[in-house]
Amino acid sequence: MSQDGTWSDESDWELDDSDLAEFGPVVAVVGRPNVGKSTLVNRILGRREAVVQDVPGVTRDRVSYDAMWTGRRFVVQDTGGWEPDAKGLKRLVAEQASVAMRTADAVILVVDVGVGATDADEAAARILLRSGKLVFLAANKVDGEKGESDASALWSLGLGEPHAISAMHGRGVADLLDKVLAALPNVAESTSLDGGLRRVALVGKPNVGKSSLLNKLAGDQRSVVHEAAGTTVDPVDSLIEMGGRVWRFVDTAGLRRKVGQASGHEFYASVRTHGAIDSAEVVIMLIDASEPLTGQDQRVLSMVIDAGRALVLAFNKWDLVDEDRCDLLEREIDRELVQVRWAQRVNISAKTGRAVQKLVPAMENSLASWDTRIATGPLNIWIKAVVAATPPPVRGGKQPRILFATQATARPPTFVLFTTGFLEACYRRFLERRLRETFGFEGSPIRINVRVREKRGLKRR
């Protein structure tokens, strides 16, 4: 690490091949844009995971999913459309597909039989033949005898038998999977893909730097990064070693607009962002420190709060923040982020690598708080002292009493107070502040539920 707190060699954080071997064989699904790759991935998974729309270029990253077939686990990778002469953003997408070709244990090349073998298909076939990988040719969109005849013409690609399938309707997919898995090493059904890894979701509005941060941490172009807002559509899982442990990062699509206003693949991606937050344990919320806080920031933050996840606020693009902007930002935080004063805060630059290593202790502290349990005895001793010093406000001419307190659950810490009457929201916020002052909980939300007990002898009818 250099003196300014940045990493001089990001490759120190990247998993090598031996680290990744324990997570099972990888099957990459590649091909030109709009040949049905994501539809095939969804068919393999048996559920709608990959974002699908009848428009070329919807999938832009290589996205990994835990899959199972006939009791055997493996990883299936969806990729963006591969084009040999692509430029700009399309070239970056094509590079992701090329990486998948190189790193996977087996490759399924998908070709549209209705179009036939194109120059791009032939170029992909040549690359795959030279790679020495296990390659299976999927002749997609076969729905009848003519399709089967068209599939036979794909022998010309030199990849062996074309497997006639219809990813949309499921035709031939089972036979294809049987042959793919027969060629792969066995993976025990009990193998866990996560292996107990802590799950991290990267969230924030479009173009805030989520993919850039993921790439900086992983040391490679794991997510497609482009100046155009919203270039990440699918959540992208990455296993990254930091601080002596491996973390599972999910790079979520930016929410360009409210879910109700989204359309097409933007809608599905926004739904997937909700899912990524729900499946995570700790969330890194990226905020553009160089610009004023926006309604989009607030909406994404509300999603995290509602999910009850541990939280780290990462103020990105700190290299663009001058002294005047820093003063303005502090006032914005005090005014607009009052509901998450408990969150861990790190000022970073995903572009330069400034202070990104500070994310590790921030996540660890947040997760430790999120996992915390307080024994019932010490909790009730504490609550009695607090109530004696500051009793609950009178309500309806009566002052409610807190009879008993217990922590019902962790993740997030949830407390239940048994009382003789309703506790005002302001008093519950007061109790939360005092809980944090005494027990910490930095980086984790706290939930306080109140249960009003009836008087003894009062029978329900």
Curated annotation (Swiss-Prot):
Q: Record's HAMAP family? A: GTPase_Der
A Pfam family assignment: MMR_HSR1
In this chain the KH-like domain maps to 372-454
Function of the molecule: GTPase that plays an essential role in the late steps of ribosome biogenesis.
Q: Which PANTHER family match?
A: GTPASE DER (PTHR43834:SF6)
Subunit structure, interactors included: Associates with the 50S ribosomal subunit.
Q: In its keyword annotation, does this UniProt entry include Iron?
A: no
Family per record: Belongs to the TRAFAC class TrmE-Era-EngA-EngB-Septin-like GTPase superfamily. EngA (Der) GTPase family.
Positions binding GTP 1 in this chain are 31-38, 78-82, 140-143
Signal peptide limits: none
Q: Which GO terms describe its biological process?
A: ribosome biogenesis
Name-wise, this protein is GTPase Der
**Binding, GTP 2:** 204-211, 251-255, 316-319
List keywords of the entry alphabetically: GTP-binding, Nucleotide-binding, Repeat, Ribosome biogenesis
- Write down the PROSITE patterns for this protein, in alphabetical order: G_ENGA
Please tell me the species this chain comes from: Mycobacterium leprae (strain TN)
Cross-referenced InterPro entries, in alphabetical order? G_ENGA (IPR031166), GTP-bd (IPR006073), GTPase_Der (IPR016484), KH_dom-like (IPR032859), KH_dom-like_a/b (IPR015946), P-loop_NTPase (IPR027417), Small_GTP-bd (IPR005225)
Query: SUPFAM superfamilies in the record, alphabetically?
Result: P-loop containing nucleoside triphosphate hydrolases
Gene3D superfamilies in alphabetical order = 3.30.300.20, P-loop containing nucleotide triphosphate hydrolases
* GO molecular-function terms, A-Z: GTP binding; ribosome binding
